[in-house]
């Protein structure tokens, strides 16, 4: 089982080691509907009724062989009707691939990573009240009543207010 996993990993490495992974393929003598078909590297694809495949080179990551087959049997055992080896240099140059075909090497764009914060900080303001010195009320000079209920309530309210302030 370990050998099988190693073989699959090696095979996928050889298949996808190339920098260019698809090709915009044009059949020159066809109508515009068939003029621009994207063909993935190493995948047998029908383009305008014909079958093509871009075979990557095992030693040069930018070199490919374009192959056209008469049937959908795009395998190594079947001899292609047309072959042409070329080297990709950029994503804009068109390569002549026989008398009828041309292709432009392409690289699948990798999206920029999305950064998602894992923790959203929460800021809770802390307010510390500053105690103020409240002057003691001076007795009113106009009042002649001492010990009245209103004075007791006012004094009691002042004491409670002072206690609440001291707790904060």
Curated annotation (Swiss-Prot):
One Gene Ontology cellular component annotation held by this UniProt entry: cell surface
Signal peptide boundaries: 1-19
Localisation per UniProt entry: Cell membrane
Glycosylated residues (UniProt): 110, 114, 116, 118, 120, 122, 124, 126, 128, 130, 132, 134, 138, 140
Sites of GPI-like-anchor amidated glycine lipidation: 147
Sequence repeats: 116-119, 120-123, 124-127
Region (3 X 4 AA tandem repeats of T-P-T-V): 116-127
Name of the featured protein: Prespore-specific protein A
Organism: Dictyostelium discoideum
């Amino acid at each position: 089982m370990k050998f099988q996993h190693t073989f699959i990993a090696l095979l996928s490495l050889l298949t996808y080691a190339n920098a260019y992974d698809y090709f915009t393929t044009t059949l020159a003598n066809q109508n515009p509907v068939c003029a621009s078909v994207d063909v993935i590297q190493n995948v047998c694809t029908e383009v305008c009724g014909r079958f093509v495949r871009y075979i990557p080179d095992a030693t040069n990551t930018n070199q490919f062989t374009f192959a056209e087959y008469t049937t959908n049997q795009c395998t190594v055992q079947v001899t292609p009707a047309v072959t042409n080896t070329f080297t990709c240099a950029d994503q804009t140059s068109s390569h002549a691939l026989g008398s009828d075909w041309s292709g432009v090497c392409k690289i699948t764009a990798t999206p920029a990573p999305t950064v998602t914060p894992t923790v959203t900080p929460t800021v809770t303001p802390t307010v510390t009240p500053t105690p103020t010195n409240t002057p003691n009320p001076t007795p009113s000079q106009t009042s002649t009543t001492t010990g009245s209920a209103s004075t007791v309530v006012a004094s009691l309210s002042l004491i409670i207010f002072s206690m609440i302030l001291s707790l904060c």
